[in-house]
């Protein structure tokens, strides 16, 4: 049940989220793994979750008709959002907005096949009052088994 050193799913997700558009992180993502990246900005946390879920489904990272996959992704997204928002998922209610890059990675980080597939969600960007220049950097990571 050892975590494979070359299969650190959270690290891969973080590197993808941290990479600028013109950067290509040097990653050797296993061929049978799936991933997607994107951007989302909103004062509404529901829109942030929906954008990431839509990206994962449209890029075939998760299957649209399998509830447990959507459920696992949801929990990984929420865990990553907790990191970005310091445990307070509220955005608009407390006059906060986010501008985030995200990466979603699905794969098998453990040696044993019985450990199954996992999903990692990494978020990187800014959070702050909806006034330009009043935001600061934030980062979050969520990992969940499928």
Curated annotation (Swiss-Prot):
Keyword Transcription regulation: yes
Quaternary state and interactors: Homohexamer.
GO biological process: one example: positive regulation of gene expression
Top-level taxonomic group: Bacteria
Organism: Bacillus cereus (strain ZK / E33L)
Keyword Glycoprotein tagged: no
Keyword line: Activator, Histidine metabolism, RNA-binding, Transcription, Transcription regulation
One Pfam family hit: HutP
Function comment: Antiterminator that binds to cis-acting regulatory sequences on the mRNA in the presence of histidine, thereby suppressing transcription termination and activating the hut operon for histidine utilization.
Protein name (record): Hut operon positive regulatory protein
Similarity section: Belongs to the HutP family.
GO molecular function: mRNA binding
InterPro entries: Regulatory_HutP, Regulatory_HutP_bacillales, Regulatory_HutP_sf
Gene: hutP
């Amino acid at each position: 049940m050892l975590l494979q050193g070359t299969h650190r799913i959270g690290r891969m997700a973080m590197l993808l989220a941290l990479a600028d558009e013109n950067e290509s992180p040097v990653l050797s993502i296993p061929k049978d793994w799936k991933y997607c990246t994107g951007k989302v900005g909103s004062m509404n946390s529901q829109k942030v979750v929906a954008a990431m879920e839509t990206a994962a489904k449209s890029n075939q990272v998760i299957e649209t008709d399998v509830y447990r996959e959507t459920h696992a992704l949801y929990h990984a997204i929420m865990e990553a959002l907790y990191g970005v928002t310091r445990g307070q998922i509220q955005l608009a209610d407390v006059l906060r907005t986010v501008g985030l890059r995200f990466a979603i990675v699905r794969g098998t980080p453990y040696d044993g096949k019985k450990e199954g597939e996992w999903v990692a969600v990494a978020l990187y960007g800014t959070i702050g009052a909806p006034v330009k220049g009043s935001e600061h950097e934030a980062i979050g990571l969520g990992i969940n088994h499928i």
